[in-house]
Amino acid sequence: MAQHTVYFPDAFLTQMREAMPSTLSFDDFLAACQRPLRRSIRVNTLKISVADFLQLTAPYGWTLTPIPWCEEGFWIERDNEDALPLGSTTEHLSGLFYIQEASSMLPVAALFADGNAPQRVMDVAAAPGSKTTQIAARMNNEGAILANEFSASWVKVLHANISRCGISNVALTHFGGRVFGAAVPEMFDAILLDAPCSGEGVVRKDPDALKNWSPESNQEIAATQRELIDSAFHALRPGGTLVYSTCTLNREENEAVCRWLKETYPDEVEFLPLGDLFPGANKALTEEGFLHVFPQIYDCEGFFVARLRKTQAIPALPAPKYKVGNFPFSPVKDREAGQIRQAAASVGLNWDGNLRLWQRDKELWLFPVGIEALIGKVRFSRLGIKLAETHNKGYRWQHEAVIAHASPDNVNAFELTPQEAEEWYRGRDVYPQAAPVADDVLVTFQHQPIGLAKRIGSRLKNSYPRELVRDGKLFTSNA
């Protein structure tokens, strides 16, 4: 693999020499940082099993190497990236996999370790969505996830990735992470705080990542991290699990933040060791039981992961002073909900008791039941998924609901050929050789729902959202 030149401030190198355990080679660290990062993907098991994904992609010539800490994760090598970018493959467009750095799969693995099965989870800094979608897959789209993102522009990206992956148990919020301890005290079974950090571990992806680095900035960032982990710990219920992670390497933003929390709440914080998280985890294990992953250990990004348990309740913070405002939705009455469910089933849309119907004007939404306890406590940017819009002739079913809840085995499902599917993803109407019988058609490809279409004569009218339309080559088999 080609080398690239990474910028290292002298003070950073001094700090790394002090932080690195004696069992590791500093020369190996420098050499690893100069190698470009291996690409990796995570199979979206909400859509397809790992075995079926491997069978589907076997003809493509992809080399997939298992990632030890994530059974659905793989390092990927492919020869045709220039001809067909990985993010433009139809398997990616239909949500069968997520392009995710291998190290960033570690925090969710830690969150669900030892049989942990939380029902209400918060992802404090969620965008672009790799960990939120990984959490949703581990929860099998059940329970509820509060995915928060401070950056307004990233909230849209977060929603797009959640929608593409067919996820319906998520509520999105747009706050600074400091608010949650006061706003929703002790309400979550598990919390992931993948904290904003100095990014020292990402130099293999971004050789200039340390251009603005300084020891002083590390101190400033660590102060913010202490505020965030304190807020998250207040929002965690007694007995719950908190995973703290960063993509940086200094101790000030990692071990020291966790030790500060333990010193602040000595009787309420328990460190849960991660040495048995996966075979070979002990190579990155700290004396506290955290994983401090230097890039040469597993040939990946630098990363840090700690797992904590809240052993008992702590005093509440002062109530927040902001006003949430009126909640513009109302629950749909049982009789009407039954009629809506029946109409949805006719086009292949079904959902279980984890979701409940709510209405706003002519809009119908599905909200995760587990998030209802938070209504009135925080203001949501987006909650659940939009199911349909009502009109005089019935319902206009929404694309995100189709991706999340349509069954490809529905009687009105119509499987496209590769050529037809390529037209569909480009936003064009499709003219199948043998037109379907039904007027309202669930369009599928590779046995995956990719949208709804209305049959008009010999053509299928395309309803693929304009913002998702793609140009260029889309199919690995044609590359």
Swiss-Prot record:
InterPro entries: Methyltr_RsmF_N, MeTrfase_RsmB-F_NOP2_cat, MeTrfase_RsmB-F_NOP2_dom, Nol1_Nop2_Fmu_2, Nop2p, RCMT, rRNA_ssu_MeTfrase_F, RsmB/NOL1/NOP2-like_CS. One of its GO terms (cellular component) is cytoplasm. GO terms for biological process: rRNA base methylation. It is an enzyme of class 2 (transferase). Keywords: Cytoplasm, Methyltransferase, RNA-binding, rRNA processing, S-adenosyl-L-methionine, Transferase. GO terms for molecular function: RNA binding; rRNA (cytosine-C5-)-methyltransferase activity. S-adenosyl-L-methionine binds at A125, A126, A127, P128, G129, S130, K131, E149, G177, D194. It catalyses: cytidine(1407) in 16S rRNA + S-adenosyl-L-methionine = 5-methylcytidine(1407) in 16S rRNA + S-adenosyl-L-homocysteine + H(+). Pfam families: Methyltr_RsmB-F, Methyltr_RsmF_N, Methyltranf_PUA, YebU_pre-PUA_dom. Its EC number is 2.1.1.178. The active site is at C247 (nucleophile). It comes from the Bacteria. It is found in: Cytoplasm. Specifically methylates the cytosine at position 1407 (m5C1407) of 16S rRNA. Belongs to the class I-like SAM-binding methyltransferase superfamily. RsmB/NOP family. This is Putative ribosomal RNA small subunit methyltransferase F. The gene is rsmF.
